[in-house]
UniProtKB/Swiss-Prot annotation:
Keywords from the UniProt entry: Chloroplast, Plastid, Ribonucleoprotein, Ribosomal protein
Protein name from the UniProt record: Small ribosomal subunit protein bS16c
Gene transcribed to yield this protein: rps16
A molecular function (GO) term: structural constituent of ribosome
Swiss-Prot/TrEMBL GO biological process terms: mitochondrial translation
Chief location: plastid
Length: 85
């Protein structure tokens, strides 16, 4: 099973996260299938690759709670509803 989850990057005290599609059995820093976004909690910046995220969600990938909250905050699911209608 594939999940969309955060992968920690950056330096000490300056965490930056990549949003990645990764197998559930892999550890947090393990090899990801694909990078689908970027999240910087310090600068409050988010960058999403919408087609890649849609692809993985259609294939059955489950976002973690934190990734789901980031996508919801970026109004991702409103865009998804617009593309489906």
């Amino acid at each position: 099973m594939v999940k969309l989850r955060l992968k920690r990057c950056g330096r000490k005290q300056q965490a930056v996260y990549r949003i990645v599609a990764i197998d559930v059995r892999s550890r947090r820093e393990g090899r990801d299938l694909r990078k689908v976004g970027f999240y910087d909690p310090i600068k409050n910046q988010t960058c999403l690759n919408v087609p890649a995220i849609l692809y993985f969600l259609e294939k059955g990938a489950q976002p973690t709670r934190t990734v789901y909250d980031i996508l919801r905050k970026a109004e991702f699911f409103k865009e998804k509803e617009r593309t489906l209608s």
